[in-house]
Structure formats: structure tokens, C-alpha cells
Amino acid sequence: MSDITQRFRLDDRVALVTGAGRGIGRACALGLAQAGAEVWLMARTRDEIDQAAAEIRAAGGKAHTAVCDVTDTPAMRRAVAAIPVLDVLVNNAGFNIPEPFVEVSEEHLDQLLTLNVRAAFLVAQAAAQKMLQAADRKSRGGAILHMSSQMGHVGAPNRSVYCVTKHALEGLTKAMALEFAGLGIRVLSIAPTFVETPLYRKMAARPEFAAWVEGRIPMARVGQAEEVAAAVVYAASPAASLMTGTSLVVDGGWTAQ
């Protein structure tokens, strides 16, 4: 048998990561680069993606940046079109506004739906169009990875709109997987639990919230961004070549209950 560890490599592949400036997106960009991919980092904040790209280059990798708000569809389409070849999309940009269902404003509803669903859909569409331009796509392969959440599989208090958006991504994953299975492009979702990022640390400043989260996770801890990135690298690589239309749940057992 050939060296199976080589199936986890992404040499000669090009990946785009949205929301790549911090947290999970940044970890995914660095992880993909470590696996050999040439990485495009997309985010609204230049300083953050420039720093991440510099770290990749310092380690001997290839990185490019694209300053872009993915909710600006024309700008996003131009940015994706400017990538010469694309093999992997990590559709990561998204956010949450935790609040009780009866207090959700139309403004917050629209903000979450616009970024987490509409923009995610259109980014995936632009990426798929770019991938299909490659004449050898079926043999070369490709992967579109939607950053979902454990909240795309369950529900939770004060997260009604967020759950709506992540359940939508799970449905999109399955529908896209069926359309692209014969074209060489796999489509998967990555569904992490709460992950220790600057955003989580802000929420966990309330001891009762941190206790609730850790009490719900059978492994009794939140995730690390690198653990999510490891799942992304696997899902993007030939090691996952028979996987499509499903979700990699990285949740310490939350959804097993």
C-alpha cells in the first residue's frame, strides 16, 4: 500500500478561506498552508490577513490576500474571479448575535441572514463557477467546505436566528453535494462547538455562560481553532475523497446527547 499519510497533503492545490483574519478562519488558512496548499485569505480587515499571510510565507508557504466584504456581491465576485485556479473553498465568514427570540429585531435578522446565508450561498456559487473552469476538474478534484456549527444540528436558547442560518448551510451542503458529485467537487460542512476565540472569550467573561457551555460538552472543554482547522484540512484533502454531502461535527460530544 502506498504511503497513506500523503493523502492528507494539499500540494499543488489552491484554497480560498473567507473570514480568514482571525479565529477559526485564520487557523484554517495556516493549516491548509502547512498541508501544502497555496492559500488566498479573504476578509474585510487588511492588517489581519496581511499578518496571517506573512506568517504563512515566513514558514515557506504561498499566500495571497483579498480585502473584501463578502456581503458586497460584485466585489466578492471580482475577488474570486481574480484567483487563477481554485480547488478548495472554506466558506467561513459568519457571525452571531445571541438574544432571546422575542427580542430579535428585523435589523439583526437581516444582518445574520445576509452574511451567514445569502453571502455564503453566493460565495459558494462564485467558487464553484471558478472551479468548473478547470478542464481537468473531475480528475483534479475539489472541495467546498461550509463552516456550519453544532447549532446546525440542534437548537439552543438565545440562538434562534443563528440556528436558522446554520441549519440552512446544512441543507445547502446536501443539495450542492448531489449536484457536484459527478463533477469532481465534494461539498461538506464543518460543525464545531464553541471554540476558544476572541469572540468566545468575550462571551465566556460571564461565568454562568462558561459553566453552561462546558457543562453541555461531555469532554468538558471548548474547542481550539486548530482542532477545527485539522478537520478542514482532512475534509479538503484526498484522504476524504469519498466524503460528500455530510457534516464533520467537531463538538466534544454536544450533539450526541
Feature locations, PLM:
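Alpha-helical segment proximal to the catalytic Tyr-Lys
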Residues: 129, 178-179, 241
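C-terminal substrate-recognition "lid" of short-chain dehydrogenase/reductases
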Residues: 221-250, 255-256
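Conserved glycine-rich cofactor-binding loop
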Residues: 14, 21-23
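Residue(s) in the substrate-gating loop at a strand-loop-helix junction
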Residues: 149
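Substrate-binding pocket helix/loop in short-chain dehydrogenase/reductase
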Residues: 100-101, 105-113, 213
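Short, small/polar-rich loop/turn modules that mediate ligand/substrate recognition or access, typified
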Residues: 181, 186, 243-245
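Active-site helix of classical SDR
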Residues: 124, 165, 173
